[in-house]
Structure formats: structure tokens, C-alpha cells
């Protein structure tokens, strides 16, 4: 019963951190406890159909807070997104240099380990070009874990947590007909986006469907709180389960690279986030999460847990995903062409398993 065990451990961590008042405790706690259990050798796993269902549910909840008030300042988004794209490129360059100079990684592994997000594509390229798959995976997963735990705590420490985004819609379903319409439209939009291979298609498709219905004032309901909480807990478990098949010894061997690269990427992201806050009328918490170098789906769940503006955060993470995906693919293939026969690193072995995003 590994799935039941995973969900129980996730619930223990998520509810526990929530009860002690930790911001975003559901996603942070579930990810932390599942990650620790996976490192301890427990078989942590979430079935793909269940994970996909939760992506759709979270997308519906994110879209439920869309209202004219949440789109205030949308005209200034292009400048903010442009700065984010520049920040992503600077993060990759700085972190690549760090991994090369400090930890001696080969150029290709350093580039792929430095990518802020786009983990599925990065792991595919790592396996295709025989890079240090396990090291790259650990650096990426540790970065997400540190962000999910550190961001809420940091925002709370500096008094930057925000009240829930107020919507004109009720958050408890009072009409089963409207709820059925909401779920049906959002699910169809999610499936269409998935079929089109849109980045984060299930979550963004459901967000688009739900956001349209709520923004157009066509429905006035959302999912009950328990459904949203269960979805957030489960997606936290999905992120934590990425530590499966990683021994503590292997984790420790890459810990320096993980923490160091996280510090470099965070410093670059923070400098650009401060620039945006100084120039544009956005809340600090929204900007911080939008510029955080974490996985797109996890950052959207974190935005929901912290009651942030999902449209602003989602638009920025989508833009970063597209920019990083293109840049990494081009740069990786250039590196391979320049050194087609050069071995990557003494620890790299063909066939080392890759993590899926």
C-alpha cells in the first residue's frame, strides 16, 4: 500500500505545519515529510492519474480568484515578464559558472543543473547526452524543496504574507449545476491544453477555463475547501516523492552543489525581483514567487497556498518556462557539437534513471 502510506505521510506533514501556523503549510509539510520518508527508503509514490486529477483541481481553484481586481496593472506585465526572462538567463549563466568553477562539473551537466525549472526537458536532455543525470536531478529537486520551505518562512519573517485574494464568487458550492459546469468546462480546457502539449497544460488549462467563467461572471461557485486541501497535499507529495531511489549518501555527495547553486540562483532572482518591485506596482510577495527559480507546477501550488495572484504568477512562470526551454535546448546541443567525443564526468553512467517533472 505505498500510495496510501504516501498520502498518510503527506497529510501528517501538511496538517502538522498548518496547525503550527507555517505559511503554505499544506504543500511545504507534505513535500518535506514525503521527501524524508523517501530518503529513509520508504516506497513513496503517487499514481499519474491521481496527480493529473489534482493538477486540474488546483487549476480550477486558481481560476476561481480571477476577477477584474486581480488584473489591475496588467498593462505593466510585459516589462515585468521581460525582466524575468533576462533574470532567467542571468541565473543560468551564473549558476553554470558556479557549478563549473566550484564543483568541477562538466559544461553540459553544469548547464542542465543550472536551468531554473523545465525539469522534465532537462532530465530528457541529460539522459540523451549522457550527462550526470543523478546529480542534475538532485540539484533540481533540492532547489524546489528549499524554495517551498524557505519562501513562505521568509515572507512571514519579513511580514510580507498577504490576505486571501478576495473574489466576488463564493468559495463554497451553493449550486450543483454551476459546479458541474465549472468542472466540465475546466476539465475540457485542461484536456485540450494537454493534447496540445502546452507547458503545464492540465493546470493552466483548468485555470483558463475556471478563470474565464469566473471573470465573465458566469459562475459563482468553486470547489469545497476539502477538495482543494486534498489536491494541494497530494501535489506536495508528488514533489517530495522525487527523492525516491536516492540514498542519503548520494544526496550528501551533491549537497554542496545543491545549496550553492540555489544560493547563486536566489541571489540573481532576488536582485531582479527588487528591481521590479521598485519600478512597478506589484505586491512583493507576488513578485518574489513569480521570480523564484522553482518548478512551474509547484510554484503555482505555492501561489494558491499563499493566497497570491495566480494570473500574474502563472504568466511569469509560463514565460520563464518557454524562455528556459528554448535556451537550454539550443545551448546543450551547441555544447555537444563542440565536444562530441569528450566524456562528461567520471561518475556518469549510461542508463542512470531520470526523474520526471
Stretches with model-predicted labels:
Residues 16-32, 51-55, 77-88, 109-114, ...:
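Structural signature of hydrophobic alpha-helical transmembrane segments
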Residues 31-76, 209-215, 225-252:
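Hydrophobic transmembrane alpha-helices of secondary-active transporters
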Residues 7, 11, 146-149, 160-218:
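Core mid-bundle transmembrane helix pairs that form the ion/substrate translocation pathway
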Residues 117-122, 137-156, 268, 296-298, ...:
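Membrane-embedded alpha-helical segments of transport systems
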Residues 2-9, 15, 66-97, 179, ...:
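Entry/N-cap segments of selected transmembrane alpha helices
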Residues 102-142, 282-316:
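Alpha-helical membrane segments and immediately flanking helix-loop junctions
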Residues 14-28, 36, 40-51, 190-204, ...:
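Flexible hinge motifs at transmembrane-helix junctions and intramembrane kinks/re-entrant loops
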Residues 68-76, 157-174, 216-223, 249, ...:
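Membrane-interface helix termini and inter-helical loops of multi-pass transporters
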